[in-house]
Amino acid sequence: MEARQLLEALHVAERLKDETRHCTTTKGTPENVASHSWRMALMAYFMTDEFPELDMNKVIKMCLIHDLGECFTGDIPTFRKTQADEDREASLLSNWVRSLPDPYASDMTALYAEMDALSSQEAKLYKSIDKLEAVIQHNESPISTWEPHEYELNRTYATDIVQFSDYLKVLRAEILKDTNDKIAAGK
């Protein structure tokens, strides 16, 4: 990628640093989309030994690019996002991706198709990490920031997507333990 094209792409991606998400950090700072994606990529890296048969570089790429559409639409929590919101985000993202030079445009287009269809183990792992990281972050945020429906959501979110992996099922159980401990402590 030429230097100017790289800078232009980074200027778009920088918007995610300002795009706040629904919850906060441990100290009450609003979480942003960039930090969510970064920690997802870190999770994938730390899981490399657990998934030796997978292309973990692909999973890390998926984690890094998965929310780029929110550069154009902002973050809408999953429990509020409508199909119209998803369609608008997909359209704006697709237009931007097509403006990138190859091989990035074609690589990202293929990755997004794979991610949307959950057509590979890598895509299933990325999606599991996406959901698990959100629950972990909620567990780390002050319970005073939780909405009433999140008490049950934190107990159940991502239990379906992790079923393909024994490791992820164990991780989800550990996260559930943290959720239940947090609720019991009221913090």
What are these model-derived regions, one by one?
Residues 1-187:
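Alpha-helical, largely C-terminal catalytic domains
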